[in-house]
Amino acid sequence: MKIVLQNNEQDCLLACYSMILGYFGRDVAIHELYSGEMIPPDGLSVSYLKNINMKHQVSMHVYKTDKKNSPNKIFYPKMLPVIIQWNDNHFVVVTKIYRKNVTLIDPAIGKVKYNYNDFMKKFSGYIITLSPNSSFTKKKRISEIIFPLKKIFKNRNTFLYIFSLFISQIVALWFSIILRDILNKSHDITYSFIMMISLVLFQTLSLLMKLGAQKNTNLLYESKISRQIFKGIFSRPLLYFRNNSVGTIIEKINLRTGIRDGILLKIFPSLLNFFTVFIVIIYLGTISFTLTLFLVIMNLLYMIFSFSLISIKRQANIQYTQQTIDFTSVVQEDLNQIEQIKAQANEKECVKRWTKKSAQTIFSYNKILNIDGITSAFNQGFNYICVILMMIFGIYLNQGNLVSIPDLIIFQSGISLFVSAVNQIQDVMFEISRLSIYGNKISDLLIENPQRIDNIEKHSNNAIILKDISYSYELNNYIFNNINFSIKKGEKIAIVGKSGSGKSTLFNILLGLISYEGEVTYGYENLRQIIGVVSQNMNLRKGSLIENIVSNNNSEELDIQKINDVLKDVNMLELVDSLPQKIFSQLFENGKNLSGGQIQRLLIAKSLLNNNKFIFWDEPFSSLDNQNRIHIYKNVLENPDYKSQTIIMISHHLDVLKYVDRVIYIDDKKIMIDKHNNLLLNDSYNSFVNE
């Protein structure tokens, strides 16, 4: 069964689902199983699973089994493979049941074996079976990375690279021939010296060709793969980034270099070296057919043993790769919560969690080291045995004048070459498997999502118009259904409602960050260039203060008076002027040399600058005290200097309601929009604001 690794903890069941579909002959990637832009907030519900079952023409059954029975009594061969719940919060695929062991594929780490006792400790008791319907059709899928890889490696650069490797192999063989001729005294010193100079020249030529081809291929790889991955990432909807941790996305991005290096540095050289061996065999056969046959037989025996280790090493590498990704995700998650960890003195728990995850990574890495150690020890032992047997056999042939001593030296070199070729073929098979996994993990990033085209009516008096807008995480389970309203240019709007009512969802619809049903029309030309945003997750970058608040900080074009006016309106001018270099002072990464409230006020200033006309604020006052908050209410929301700028905000500070033109109130999936005083006549709104 083809192994499919999960992208994150949330889609482990989808990874298992993908593996079962692949077993039946329908090759479907995890990202193709997503219904929309993300897994619903409440997880993989029954309706969600029913939809993908219908789409992929399979039937699903869920069983609760008695855990008192042993695995061979719970699972019978014909029902395998099946999905089971694991540790109460995870899913895996059971593939084989043996007398004492169970083989399963964990989408977090790959294929693993458990004895009955350990298996039953982790098995939660729930079994999910999938079976094809009568309408089920098989489907082969070509990974999205295959086509761009062909473009990169099917060209002149690859030919030059392979040719340079071929020259290098020929030089190595040529060296052995020259050495044999010197020992046989076949040529004089002058001839031998000329041959040595020629070897150096050809080796240098090979190196120059190789470096040139590698550099050109790297540039092509960057333009075809890396750039496409970057475009694919930024074409993803906002919900994609909420469904995947920063650590997971970074790890997936970094896999691209592993694919390039695996092809250039391992697969190509190894394949060429293996094929060069056949030339060596032909040459050695002309010296002594008997010794060549002996050499081939010995290396076939070596190959049989070595190849038995490939699957074990491949699985160990899968585990190590996934464990590394998991460890990075845990570290990223904890570091994002460092303030809470410090405040609650949870450092010991974090150290314990990191240590456990790191130990799992080291355990997987040690398995690779063990396999490499066994392989290395066997290689050395085989070399010793093979050389000794070759010498014993060769001396016997030498006594019969069938081979010379220099010939034996050539055959000794042949042993090393053969062993190296077999090892490299192992590496090729290992790399192909590894790169297949890497390719599948980043395949979704190579797909550029089509972008919604904003509907613009630039001469409209409205900043935005919503017509028959509906939104749902799941089919027919609508958060909003057929909502209609408009906001005029220059209006200041506050969105309020109880927690979980859908404020952020509506905010993201207005901003065009999530998909929806219906039509949104904007009243601004070049909309995306004149939008200012303050979100809960925004922060400052490392660099000067001016670089953080002004998009074009060309000193000749800076309107210092305008910048100072805005900084004064958000109550930051006095602080900025107290800095050594004022607005040109340097900020640390994430603005760590400022307080949370100062960062928030600078972000508000940034949203108001840069010729922005349509402003969106999501909880912009969460870190501000009453004094600074009221200052912004009076100096921005009520300031005629900002009358042409439309501001839409979410805020849990209800004192802002007296300073805005209208309020959008969300209650039980319904939307009311009116002036604050008019909405107070509504019992639900009145109760909400006076709680």
Curated annotation (Swiss-Prot):
Q: What is its main location?
A: membrane
- Keywords of this protein's UniProt record, alphabetized? ATP-binding, Bacteriocin transport, Cell membrane, Hydrolase, Membrane, Nucleotide-binding, Protease, Protein transport, Thiol protease, Translocase, Transmembrane, Transmembrane helix, Transport
In terms of Pfam families, this protein maps to: ABC_membrane, ABC_tran, Peptidase_C39
Q: Name one GO biological process term.
A: proteolysis
Task of the protein:
Probably implicated in the export process of the lantibiotic lacticin-481/lactococcin-DR.
Location of the active site? C12
* Residue ranges occupied by any ABC transmembrane type-1 domain in the UniProt entry: 158-434
Membrane-spanning intervals of the chain: 159-179, 189-209, 262-284, 289-311, 385-405
Where does it reside?
Answer: Cell membrane
Q: Which Gene3D superfamilies match?
A: ABC transporter type 1, transmembrane domain, Cysteine proteinases, P-loop containing nucleotide triphosphate hydrolases
**How is the protein disposed in the membrane?**
Multi-pass membrane protein
Official protein name in the record: Lacticin-481/lactococcin-DR transport/processing ATP-binding protein lcnDR3
One Gene Ontology MF term: cysteine-type peptidase activity
Tell me which family the UniProt entry assigns to this protein. Answer: Belongs to the ABC transporter superfamily.
InterPro entries per the UniProt record, alphabetical: AAA+_ATPase (IPR003593), ABC1_TM_dom (IPR011527), ABC1_TM_sf (IPR036640), ABC_transporter-like_ATP-bd (IPR003439), ABC_transporter-like_CS (IPR017871), Lacticin_481_peptidase (IPR033839), P-loop_NTPase (IPR027417), Peptidase_C39 (IPR005074)
Domain Peptidase C39, chain residue ranges per copy: 6-130
Top-rank lineage group of the source organism: Bacteria
Sequence positions that bind ATP: G497, K498, S499, G500, S501, G502, K503, S504
ABC transporter domain location is: 464-689
Q: Which GO terms describe its cellular component?
A: plasma membrane
